[in-house]
């Protein structure tokens, strides 16, 4: 099938965000084309999903495919932040509840989503990279004279080249973020979360929680020196993904002091700093069977996640340290809001200016909530046994994890799933943890700023929060609009219509 010369919507990128957006749009009968640079199936990291994935998949009729595929079922996750007992976030609070998620091999799960976009009616092409985007002045647009994207040039792996015109553009191009980095130039890095990641795949690892109700769930453990954390994620191909996320500056210092000479040796040396996970790697049975992979893990965000006739989705706009497995959630939730806002604009539910701003604000809110909880967890990890997330004298973090549960499980971003007050409480709690109020203005029992960890990083944390405050809003209602999630009528509606 030849790549068409014109489409109503062009989606750049066939990962979870792009494929989800394309599926939702195509199911509305909207002419949608997806151009993906890689050839599917392709490798990707980010293998643990959160509870919100289920309602998102159900909305595009993809949930049953995932249920029946054979991925490792994820009923929750355990987090060890210091020497206190680990916290556990339970996806299944009621017996028999259909709220579990999965650990996935991304080459397989992403391929399912990419193929589903085609089944839904989108025209999908892999091995085709978008090389440039053309913009033009839109005389009908009064939004600060922002130019409108109208066409894209592409090059296929087989050497073919061409261009495609479109009415709307969804940029789901991953960390490359072609529109954010090349045209809007609005990406900002968060130096406080400037990390590096290294990981590999093991066979024969002992499951976490053997003989307990949480047996086999993913486990995330802080390194003893507070320099980072380790993930332990069992997969259905009989391997366990084990990765180390470490502050880049501290990682560089450690390498200079280390006597190891290879990335594999440094990975194994660093892994020893996670004592709980190390105990799951019995040297007589557990074997590292892959090469060590590496990636920069720098968190970033954008000042806006779109412009007239443009929507930015997933890693193309923002990325957060993956401690709470937020990547796929932010991608698919952004993919849905891109589809909702484009459908609304096409159907005349609201002006295009209101539609793109609704999408952009929603992405900023979802990113902001996850950023706050990740900052809080990072602060606790670096603080060691000093209380940050919990109160002085408290054992464990159960109370804190119950408060932030709507955010770390993603359900705060599923319309109608969580009371607004619960989301507000999670955000307020996380804000107070990251940047405590002055003495006498916070609840007693929580550690004060003067006693908190990372005093040398307070300026950097403040910079991150100031950047967040410019975009974050406490409500997901923007421009007086909210999503209308009805197949055949996807779009936006006035809050007064609810």
Curated annotation (Swiss-Prot):
Stilbenes such as resveratrol, piceatannol and pterostilbene affect the expression of the OTA cluster to reduce ochratoxin A and B production and thus could be used as naturally safe and efficient compounds in food active packaging or preservatives against ochratoxin A in food. Pterostilbene with methoxy groups demonstrated greater inhibitory and antitoxic activity than resveratrol and piceatannol. FAD binds at residues 14, 17, 47, 328. InterPro entries: FAD-bd (IPR002938), FAD/NAD-bd_sf (IPR036188), Flavin-dep_Halogenase_NPB (IPR050816). Its EC number is 1.14.14.-. Keywords: FAD, Flavoprotein, Monooxygenase, Oxidoreductase. It holds the Pfam family FAD_binding_3. Chloride binds at residues 326-327. This is Flavin-dependent halogenase otaD. The gene is otaD.
């Amino acid at each position: 099938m030849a790549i068409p010369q014109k489409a109503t919507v062009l989606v750049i990128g066939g990962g979870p965000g792009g494929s989800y957006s394309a599926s939702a749009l195509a199911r509305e009968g909207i002419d949608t084309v997806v151009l993906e640079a890689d050839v599917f199936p392709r490798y990707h990291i980010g293998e643990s999903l959160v509870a919100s994935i289920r309602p998102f998949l159900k909305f595009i009729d993809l949930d049953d495919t995932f249920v029946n595929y054979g991925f490792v079922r994820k009923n929750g996750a355990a987090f060890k932040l210091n020497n206190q007992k680990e916290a556990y976030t339970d996806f299944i609070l009621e017996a028999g509840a259909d709220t579990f998620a999965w650990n996935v091999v991304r080459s397989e799960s992403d391929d399912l989503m990419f193929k589903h976009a085609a089944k839904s009616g989108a025209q999908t092409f892999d091995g085709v990279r978008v090389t440039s985007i053309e913009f033009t002045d839109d005389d009908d647009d009064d939004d600060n004279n922002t130019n409108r994207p109208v066409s894209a040039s592409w090059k296929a792996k087989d050497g073919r080249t061409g261009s495609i015109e479109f009415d709307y553009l969804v940029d789901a191009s991953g960390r490359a973020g072609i529109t954010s980095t090349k045209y809007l130039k609005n990406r900002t890095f968060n130096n406080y979360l400037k990390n590096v990641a290294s990981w590999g795949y093991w066979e024969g690892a002992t499951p976490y929680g053997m003989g307990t109700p949480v047996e086999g769930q993913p486990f995330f453990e802080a390194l003893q020196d507070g320099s980072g954390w380790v993930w332990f994620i069992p997969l259905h191909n009989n391997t366990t993904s084990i990765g180390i996320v470490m502050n880049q500056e501290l990682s560089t210092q450690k390498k200079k002091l280390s006597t190891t000479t290879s990335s594999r040796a440094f990975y194994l040396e660093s892994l020893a700093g996670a004592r709980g996970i190390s105990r799951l790697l019995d040297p007589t049975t557990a074997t590292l069977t892959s090469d060590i992979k590496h990636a920069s893990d720098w968190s970033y965000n954008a000042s806006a996640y779109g412009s007239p006739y443009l929507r930015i989705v997933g890693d193309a706009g923002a990325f957060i340290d993956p401690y709470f497995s937020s990547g796929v959630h932010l991608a698919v939730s952004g993919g849905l809001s891109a589809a909702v806002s484009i459908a609304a604009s096409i159907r005349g539910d609201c002006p295009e200016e209101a539609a793109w701003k609704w999408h952009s604000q929603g992405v900023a809110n979802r990113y902001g909530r996850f950023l706050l909880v990740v900052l809080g967890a990072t602060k606790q990890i670096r603080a060691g046994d000093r209380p940050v997330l919990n109160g002085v004298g408290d054992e464990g973090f159960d109370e804190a994890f119950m408060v932030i549960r709507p955010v770390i499980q993603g359900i705060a971003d599923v319309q109608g799933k969580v009371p607004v007050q619960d989301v507000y409480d999670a955000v307020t709690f996380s804000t107070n943890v990251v940047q405590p109020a002055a003495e006498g203005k916070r609840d007693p029992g929580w550690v004060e700023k003067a006693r908190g960890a990372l005093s040398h990083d307070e300026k950097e944390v403040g910079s991150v929060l100031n950047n967040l405050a410019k975009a974050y809003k406490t409500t997901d209602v923007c421009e007086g609009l909210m999503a209308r999630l009805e197949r055949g009528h996807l779009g936006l509606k006035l809050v007064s219509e609810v």
